[in-house]
UniProtKB/Swiss-Prot annotation:
It comes from Clostridium perfringens (strain 13 / Type A). It comes from the Bacteria. NCBIfam families: PRK00124.1. InterPro entries: UPF0178 (IPR003791). This is UPF0178 protein CPE2266.
Amino acid sequence: MKIIIDGDGCAGRDIIEEVGKKHSVKILIYCTINHMINSDYSEVRMVDGGFQSVDMYVANNTEENDIVITQDYGVAAMALGKGALAISPRGYIYDNDNIDRLLFERHLSQKNRRAGGKSKGNHKRNKEDDDRLYYNLEVLIEKVKAILN
């Protein structure tokens, strides 16, 4: 088990590292060369700045029972397809019961924007998001530990 972070624009990294350290789980952060990320605990892997480069590195380096942290539903879907677990930086768990709906909603939003419509953005990150991320990341780690033991 390892935690893989889609690092471009990933809030909550300090919480993820705190939980990872607590459970001695290796953390890999993938980010483009345009984002300078430093960490005393995680291994930071810089990739080229091409379109969806980070997404492809995350997907290609995800294995069964890994935990992927991403706000991208497509990356989450690829992780789930490989037998990994996935969670958003706000602590929402992606699973086979909700990923199809999320992908469809994303498709509808993109279609609406192309037609000139507007979509509302995410709310500002708050303590509730931090608490949800901490708690649900703990839940996923314990779930993987139970599978591996």
